[in-house]
């Protein structure tokens, strides 16, 4: 066999191989999903992230031809469920719904050299599903209408012993609470709780003075006047609470932070599957029924691209790194 025939034979073999790979990829895209999809929620049932996940999962089930079931895997501030997700096969049949605490937990654990995963390398962004504003709350017994009045109250009354609650060490409210203490030079003690529900109960009872969480966790109580809203961390005032100032308006720009719920897949999930998931998430959150329910929760339907989600995640991780290092929380 001369050189020409050997080269021709090699070219034919390569061509057949590439065709087979192309057909395999096309078949994979056409058969996905081939079984039920599990959506991990790394928090207990009943919270904002869980509610949003169930709304999205229901609509995805209707359009994808396979059940999308929510699997609550709570613990360690969301890290247990996220770690399970990082180890799942990258085939699109296991996805994750997480929130603002995802980049925070990753940064805090990395700085402490105990992170089981890397948000930037172990996960693939699918979409920011919704924006959910973070709101600073207080017991109605607190004689301050916003965060600056609270700071003045504490500075001028050294005998006051106020506490602020969070959903646990290293949580969003814990970090923001310490940032608030440093920015305003006030003394206020951190009390960690095991979730948003017990924190809210202590606020309602007046045994806890200050708290903070996603708006949907306390919107009903704020509207009823049983919990007071001191500020939101959003970049602009939110329609549900038009009289509540933003932290930036109050001269506390370092506390500005967009709250969100988003969908992730394992790293190395094929691009065509990411694109399909993105399309399905956008369709779900923009369905009129879902948008109405989200609005009732104080959330805003988004449905971003994967690249927009990646950019936001990087921005918030940089922000959290700066806050944690500045306050030596690591």
Predicted regions and their residues:
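An extracytoplasmic/periplasmic, membrane-proximal ligand-sensing/linker region
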Residues: 34-36, 182-186, 223, 249, ...
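N-terminal (or domain-start) structured segment
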Residues: 29-122, 182-214, 221, 303, ...
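Bacterial N-terminal signal peptides that target proteins for export
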Residues: 2-16
């Amino acid at each position: 066999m001369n050189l020409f025939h050997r080269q021709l034979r090699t070219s034919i073999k390569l061509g057949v191989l590439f065709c087979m790979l192309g057909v395999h990829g096309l078949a994979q895209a056409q058969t996905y999903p081939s079984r039920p999809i599990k959506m991990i929620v790394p928090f207990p049932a009943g919270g904002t992230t869980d509610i949003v996940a169930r709304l999205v999962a229901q609509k995805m089930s209707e359009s994808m031809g396979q059940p999308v079931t929510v699997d609550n895997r709570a613990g360690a501030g969301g890290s247990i469920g996220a770690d399970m997700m990082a180890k799942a096969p990258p085939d699109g049949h296991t996805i994750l719904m997480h929130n603002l605490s995802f980049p925070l937990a990753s940064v805090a654990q990395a700085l402490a050299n105990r992170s089981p995963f890397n948000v930037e390398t172990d996960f693939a962004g699918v979409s920011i599903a919704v924006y959910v504003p973070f709101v600073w709350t207080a017991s109605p017994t607190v004689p301050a209408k916003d965060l600056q009045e609270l700071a003045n109250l504490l500075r001028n009354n050294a005998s006051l012993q106020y506490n602020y609650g969070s959903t646990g060490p290293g949580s969003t409210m814990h970090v923001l609470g310490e940032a608030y203490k440093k920015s305003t030079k006030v003394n206020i003690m951190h009390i960690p709780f095991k979730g948003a529900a017990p924190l809210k109960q202590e606020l309602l009872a007046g045994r806890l003075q200050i708290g903070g969480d996603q708006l949907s966790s306390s919107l009903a109580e704020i509207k009823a006047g049983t919990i007071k809203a001191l500020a939101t961390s959003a970049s602009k005032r939110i329609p549900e609470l038009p009289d509540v100032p933003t932290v930036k308006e109050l001269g506390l720009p370092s506390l500005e932070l967009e709250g969100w719920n988003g969908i992730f897949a394992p790293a190395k999930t094929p691009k065509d599957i990411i694109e399909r998931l993105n399309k399905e998430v956008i369709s779900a959150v923009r369905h009129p029924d879902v948008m109405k329910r989200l609005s009732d929760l104080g959330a805003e339907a988004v449905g971003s691209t994967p690249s927009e989600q990646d950019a936001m995640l990087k921005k918030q991780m940089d922000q959290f790194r700066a806050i944690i290092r500045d306050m030596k929380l690591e």
